[in-house]
């Protein structure tokens, strides 16, 4: 299985194992951040043997400093699957946002997980990480600021190679756009995503993400104005040549945008489940 352990600075190591398992999305990253006397890990990938071995190799490369914290950016399996193995190896505390706690425990089992709040700081000895709550991709997605390197670890809020998915069932499009603006307000130079390579043009990438969402919303509003009234019709209009493996994801994105428009009072859901603009 393909393995990459890459030091992107004296402080940060990127750990990636495997091949893409979804069109356009690279394998999940783990990010190891080393201070002078302890270190922290951001996300744990799926937790398969090769991923855990790669983590141990990277950990050894920083002198096996005590691993004080494992920060989970959100609830999805490809970011939390290694919790038990890494906790058992290191004794680290597991941290997540309150909104993700129940889902993570349900997925992984009875593991004690500490809940963090916006602005929580973790001191690693000369290195400080700050938690940024950035809901949207999921209700409890978070990012992590490493201010001294002008770097934000973004989980799946911003990806290395594509736009991210906003679930209409456990995420929120309005929150997501607000979170993108929050990340931009921190003025990072670089972004370390949950999938893909380091992003070195942070402001440009964030602007592109915001622009994409505004554009997608405008195309939905235009289609509704033209008389297209349901998700099937919107899907055909907006995604005429999409890879079939992404069809359900695209439908979910349409629904997420519609949910936002409904919450803003710009669109109504009719009794038959169709949608219409509010004049």
What annotation goes with each model-predicted range?
Residues 3-63, 143-155, 160:
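Conserved beta-strand hairpin/beta-sheet module of binuclear metal-dependent hydrolase folds
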Residues 26, 46-128, 150:
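Active-site HxH/HxHxD metal-binding segment of metal-dependent hydrolases
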Residues 39, 46-49, 128-219:
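Metallo-beta-lactamase
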Residues 80, 176, 180, 254:
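Aromatic/hydrophobic pocket-lining residues that form the small-molecule binding cavity
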Residues 222-279:
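C-terminal regulatory/interaction regions
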Residues 73-79, 137, 195, 257:
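Histidine-centered divalent metal-coordination motifs
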Residues 21-22, 113, 133-135:
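Short Gly/Pro-enriched turn/cap motifs at secondary-structure boundaries
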Residues 55, 195, 220, 261:
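Residue-level signal for inorganic ion chemistry
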């Amino acid at each position: 299985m393909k393995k990459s352990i890459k030091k992107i600075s004296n402080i940060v190591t990127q750990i990636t194992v495997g091949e893409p398992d979804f069109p356009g999305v690279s394998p999940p990253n783990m990010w190891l951040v080393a201070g002078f006397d302890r270190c922290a890990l951001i996300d744990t990938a799926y937790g398969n043997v090769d991923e855990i071995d790669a983590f141990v190799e990277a950990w050894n490369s920083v002198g096996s400093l005590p691993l004080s914290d494992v920060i989970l950016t959100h609830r999805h399996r490809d970011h939390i699957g290694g919790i038990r193995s890494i906790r058992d190896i290191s004794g680290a505390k597991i941290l997540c946002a309150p909104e993700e706690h129940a889902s993570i425990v349900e997925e992984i089992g009875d593991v004690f997980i500490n809940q963090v709040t916006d602005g929580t700081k973790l001191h690693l000895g000369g290195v400080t990480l700050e938690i940024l709550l950035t809901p949207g991709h999921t209700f409890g997605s978070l990012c992590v600021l490493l201010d001294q390197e002008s770097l934000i670890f973004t989980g799946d809020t911003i990806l290395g190679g594509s736009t991210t998915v906003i679930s209409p069932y456990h995420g929120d499009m309005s929150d997501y756009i607000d979170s993108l603006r929050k990340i931009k307000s921190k003025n990072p130079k670089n972004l370390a995503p949950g999938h893909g390579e380091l992003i070195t043009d942070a402001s440009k990438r964030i602007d592109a993400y915001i622009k994409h969402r505004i554009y997608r919303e405008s195309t939905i509003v235009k289609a509704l104005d033209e008389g297209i009234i349901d998700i099937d019709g919107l899907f055909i209009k907006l995604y005429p040549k999409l890879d079939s493996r992404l069809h359900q994801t695209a439908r979910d994105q349409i629904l997420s945008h519609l949910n936002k428009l409904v919450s803003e009072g710009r669109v109504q859901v009719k009794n038959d489940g169709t949608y219409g603009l509010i004049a």
